[in-house]
């Protein structure tokens, strides 16, 4: 019988083991683009994810390179509605950069419904995009860090609506509420190797839904 190598363990988070490479999902536009640009300006190598807006993602990459020519940002396409695509995205970024230390789950589905109009299709779509995809990406990143014996961080974008509740965007709000709970549980389960936190921005950049 072949012996299985033990999983490397850590007694505490070690920032020196955290590669300065970050994947930002939904980084082609709005808040995701701003986050990617800030990371690049701060010296992080940035992987720019997009689903269908390749031109916007390339624009973000160009902006990052202008802010810091040394970071050499790359773009990656993936449909996060597919769990296998989530795994493949983490693997592709890790292979392209050699390592991955941070994940910013910025991509989100934000479609209007309410308590009377919501249905199974709307709930399922929001759940997959806003809850399951961030969880799956976090799981894959954790295993990547185990393989590299590194440390990392995940930032989940939540929404101020969770603390200023109103009945519109019903499916979206429920999916973000689930992500907020998942953030706490993942942080407890994956520490100290992987830090998982959430931030809940208010109105920051123009949304096509609200313009």
Label each residue range with its predicted role.
Residues 129-149, 187-192:
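Amphipathic alpha-helical dimer-interface segment in Rossmann-like NAD(P)H-dependent oxidoreductases
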Residues 146, 150-191, 203-204:
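Catalytic loop of short-chain dehydrogenase/reductase
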Residues 113, 203-211:
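Short beta-loop-alpha junction of Rossmann-like oxidoreductase domains
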Residues 54, 77-88, 120:
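The beta1-alpha1 cofactor-binding region of Rossmann-like NAD(H)/NADP(H)-dependent oxidoreductases
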Residues 19-20, 70, 99-101, 145-160, ...:
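Active-site loop of short-chain dehydrogenase/reductase
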Residues 28-30:
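Conserved glycine-rich cofactor-binding loop
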Residues 109, 116-135, 155, 172, ...:
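Catalytic Tyr-X3-Lys loop
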Residues 44-58:
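Conserved glycine-rich Rossmann-like NAD(P)H-binding loop of the short-chain dehydrogenase/reductase
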